[in-house]
């Protein structure tokens, strides 16, 4: 596949970069947002990861392969976005080499590429510098629909995507949702990018999910800069938005009044960007240290403050994070903060109940078995109880 074919295959991204060497990568944020995240080395790195991005493909072969490069960040990349826009970035990305200085360490790499077939096969490979291949069952050599999910970490690029059969970009266009949040939204510790809560929720709703989670982040109205283009009427406009901040605010913000001010400014900016678009605001989920005192107040006080600030806008639906039944360390990959795949599954199911069908009259009350089949479409939901 050529660069333009890769670009047309991509889903859940806002920027596409291709170097003279043919390596292509996908960016989840606007240039304005990347300027904000670029002020901190950790946020800069995490914002450049391709979390949630996948390629939609069709092949009658049974093998897929490509050249992969795991890239750290170019020191000139963020200034170029700020000063030159995407054209400047495309110039800088040309000839990008493997050895690029990294400003801050990424989390330990565990995440993989996932190739998911339309009959439920999932084949995973760790990203590395070199050639990757995926083999899957397709004995009848039918035209099989595939999704190649990019890893949550690190920042990767690929070229020479090939199959041993005919290979084309997928043509299906799905409605889009926008997922805003921290590391839990980004998908920390999921291992399989197709099994984060955002990917699972998108499958349940029959949509694509632009994942704008950034690990360690918090309520910051500036992080919404540059989304005006996404907010305009058209296919890029999200059908709904999810917002899931608060756990880092509880750790970092010096006082509850400051948190309220930041959340208030954030929700005001969000409402101004997406009038008429429902926003599902997930208050912080359970964590293993929620009983410890913090300068910002108790965990319950923070959750209540977020719910109250979100409630100022009629388009916001508040979902109580503590109502999600993962209040046990067995649902957490790190034993206390970041859910594992089962934890993410439960999160997605419960959020689907909050968003979804009329039979979930009390969002959060349905159990994991009471979930509509994937691809059921994007239903209209009433506000979640506060």
Where is each model-derived feature located?
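A structural signal for short, well-ordered beta-strand segments and their strand-loop junctions
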Residues: 66, 210-213, 281
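Residue-level signal for threonine
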Residues: 196, 220, 340
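Alpha-helical cap/lid subdomain in secreted, periplasmic
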Residues: 61, 224-386
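Acidic/histidine-rich helix-loop elements
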Residues: 211-221, 251, 336
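Serine-esterase "nucleophile elbow" of acetyl-processing enzymes
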Residues: 138-140, 150-215, 224-233
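N-terminal secretory targeting modules
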Residues: 1-177, 354-386
């Amino acid at each position: 596949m050529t660069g333009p074919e890769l670009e047309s295959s991509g889903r859940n991204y806002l920027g596409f970069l291709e170097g003279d060497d043919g390596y292509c990568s996908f960016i989840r944020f606007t240039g304005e947002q990347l300027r904000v995240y670029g002020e901190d080395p950790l946020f800069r790195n995490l914002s450049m990861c391709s979390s949630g991005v996948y390629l939609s493909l069709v092949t009658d072969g049974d093998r897929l392969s490509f050249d992969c490069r795991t890239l750290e960040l170019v020191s000139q990349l963020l200034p170029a976005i700020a000063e030159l826009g995407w054209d400047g970035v495309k110039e800088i990305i040309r000839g990008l080499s493997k050895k690029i200085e990294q400003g801050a360490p990424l989390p330990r790499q565990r995440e993989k590429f996932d190739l998911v077939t339309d009959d439920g096969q999932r084949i995973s490979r760790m990203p590395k510098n070199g050639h990757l291949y995926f083999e899957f069952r397709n004995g009848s050599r039918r035209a099989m629909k595939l999704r190649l999910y990019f890893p949550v970490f690190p920042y990767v690029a690929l070229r020479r995507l090939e199959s041993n059969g005919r290979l084309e970009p997928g043509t299906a266009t799905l409605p889009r949702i926008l997922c805003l949040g921290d590391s839990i939204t980004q998908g920390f510790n999921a291992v399989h990018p197709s099994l984060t809560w955002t990917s699972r929720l998108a499958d349940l709703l029959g949509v694509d999910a632009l994942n704008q989670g950034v690990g360690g982040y918090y309520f910051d109205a500036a992080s919404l800069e540059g989304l005006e283009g996404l907010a305009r009427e058209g296919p890029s406009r999200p059908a709904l938005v999810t917002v899931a901040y608060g756990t880092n605010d509880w750790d970092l913000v010096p006082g509850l009044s400051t948190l309220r001010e930041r959340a208030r400014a954030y929700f005001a900016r969000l409402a101004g960007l997406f009038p008429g678009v429902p926003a599902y605001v997930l208050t912080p989920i359970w964590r293993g240290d929620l009983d410890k005192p913090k300068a910002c107040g108790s965990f319950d006080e923070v959750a209540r403050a977020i719910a109250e600030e979100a409630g100022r806008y009629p388009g916001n639906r508040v979902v109580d994070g503590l109502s999600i039944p993962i209040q046990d360390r067995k649902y957490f990959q790190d034993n206390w903060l970041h859910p594992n795949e089962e934890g993410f599954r439960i999160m997605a199911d419960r959020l689907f109940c909050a968003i979804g069908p009329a039979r979930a009259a009390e969002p959060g009350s349905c159990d994991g078995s009471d979930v509509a089949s994937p691809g059921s479409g994007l239903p209209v939901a009433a506000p979640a109880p506060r």
